[in-house]
């Protein structure tokens, strides 16, 4: 970020870190459970495993042909494939997390890995698009971090299920913001379009089994608390408009 003078990325990263350190120092909350396994989490796990697994298998042959036709790019196939597997691992951890702290941990891994994959070729366009994806997702990550802080301070819990049951407007709204950025809803959809500069397997994984699905998963988890509320209406309108416009 410093080399490329992407100062918003630095500010968002520092802000997230400061919020989490402040929360851990002043409102230490021991999570009741670290995992949640139910029908929805298992469904998302199966989708990520099946679709993501097929993409990873396809990527092995694809990258060989890719660098045969694009000799101008340094061959970093090993790095590329390892990032795909890390992406899937983070997705599994995210959908099986029972509390916001662990979910946030895996949430931000997907943000960093997507940044590395989008910037794979290291061209000027790839670097620009990778940083755009990073700052937009870090903005959502900051909302996620503040939601953890508010939940710990006012609700004395970081269990996602308990936060949803309380219907607390502020943490729910902040988590919804995180979900909208991750799933590339307007006005954050441009980062997903920019991801197309990366080799095809990475953009396929972003669309079908990881980033976008992570945002959708979180919004589904929040839906009981947003039903019949202004926030729920806003999320529905944003999703509907994005569907029509994009």
Report each predicted region and the residues it spans.
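...captures the hydrophobic TM-helix bundle architecture rather than a specific catalytic motif
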Residues: 1-246
